[in-house]
Amino acid sequence: MDVRQRLAVNMKRLRKERGWSQEALADEAGLDRTYISGIERVVKNPTVTVVERIALALDCRVGNLLD
């Protein structure tokens, strides 16, 4: 599994643990829902800044998203 796949799996898991939709995560992170969807489908290649924004929204460390 490559790093983008790990990000997608971990992001989706953490989002669902919080009971959030993609729209809710997008709102919290200041991103578009379609961008969140693209990351989870491994069709988008997010920047480090975007990964950090997602981690802050999910209240986790960046490393938790990439492990």
Language-model features: locations:
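Recognition helix of helix-turn-helix/homeodomain-like DNA-binding domains
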Residues: 30-45
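Conserved hydrophobic/aromatic packing and binding residues within compact polymer-binding modules
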Residues: 11, 25-26, 36-39, 65
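Residues within helix-turn-helix
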Residues: 23, 34, 46, 52
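A detector for short, charged/polar N-terminal pre-domain segments
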Residues: 1-6
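DNA major-groove recognition helix of helix-turn-helix/homeodomain DNA-binding modules
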Residues: 49-64
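Conserved amphipathic alpha-helical interaction elements at protein-protein interfaces in regulatory
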Residues: 13, 17, 45, 57-60
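Short basic helix-loop element that most often maps to the first helix and adjoining turn
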Residues: 9-28
